[in-house]
Amino acid sequence: MNITTDSLQQAWHRLDAPGSYEWWYFDAEDESEGISVVFIWFVGFAFSPYYLSHYEEWKAHRRDDQPYPLDYGGFSFQLYQDGRETINFIKEGGRELFASEDGGIGVRFEGNRFVYDPLRDEYRLSIDFSFPARDRSVQASFSFRPLHRFDYHFDTDLHAGVDFRHQWVLSVPKAEVHGLLDITSLSSDKRQVLQFRGRGYHDHNLGTVPMYESIDRWYWGRTFSRRCDLIYYVVFLRGCSAEPQAVLMLLDHKTGRQSTFDAVRVSESRFTRGLFAPVHGKTLRLEAEGVSVEVQHQKALDTGPFYLRYTSLLSMMIGEEAQEEVRGISEFLNPAPLKSRLMQFFTASRVWRAGKQSAMYVLYNFFKHRFERVHRINRKKF
């Protein structure tokens, strides 16, 4: 796995090998309003049941047409309010829905676009989509302005025995974020307008084969605190008995010093699983020279057969000094279920494929929408 902070690597790589993928991830949180958002653009949608089914059928010679990443672009948006998911929109479609910024950094899927302005050192996001299955339309505009960046590179070409099939580009470890969300009911025209002012993060991932062919599992997380900003990234490579590839990045506000650690000892404990959630460690411990971090995964914000997103509690030692516990965001991924036809069937309940009818998608969103209405009514009562 390659790791880099090179800004030039943020542009679309135009990967065309069957099974290859690329995505651009932004998240932000406004603690004062209890709002957090996640935006992701995909080309070669790495979690698409349609893309991966096509890939497996082509690989098994049951289909002659090879799957091209550009035919499986997509966009997703999640909104969390007071720790509860209120919108989870995922749509994918053909190459006619996707475009990239010519000569620059930025992509578009339908009416959803991000672009990087190097003169202002700013990422501008504009969102415009309808979500009929949940009776919503969403328009939004957001600005991500980096507060600092790291300078780090790990190139597998220079390390014997390490196979490059995935690259992580840490674009913006911390950003000042301003935004406006306009959410409208399609049936009643009721509107909710949310002002956003908070902190955010942006990275970029890409790979040359489906994730389940190269990655066994990974953990990622971040926290912003008064003492430090911290990001960790841990990948257990498939078929590799060696220690996981791990990096820990720290900005110490007390000293102003940035540190990157890639000799990190990793231990997992308190393993658990859910009905449709993969086996994972609820406690993750990371130790490097002069730094140790223990991550306790707490409330699940989003769950699936291969993915979990949590609020987390981090305990840290910097040197000999114990830090106060801080809250963060953590994720876990086990891509193996992505290959399962059964799990692809269930995953299709969350993914709207343009031009494709899915009974699972209709039923899932019907019951989810009904549940949300009951929840809103009960909140008003109490």
From Swiss-Prot:
EC assignment: 1.-.-.-
GO terms under biological process = carotenoid biosynthetic process; chlorophyll biosynthetic process; photosynthesis
What name does UniProt use for this protein? Hydroxyneurosporene dehydrogenase
- Broad enzyme group: oxidoreductase
Organism the protein comes from: Chlorobaculum tepidum (strain ATCC 49652 / DSM 12025 / NBRC 103806 / TLS) (Chlorobium tepidum)
The UniProt family comment states: Belongs to the CrtC hydratase family.
Gene encoding it? crtC
Write out the GO MF terms: oxidoreductase activity
The record lists its disulfide bonds as none
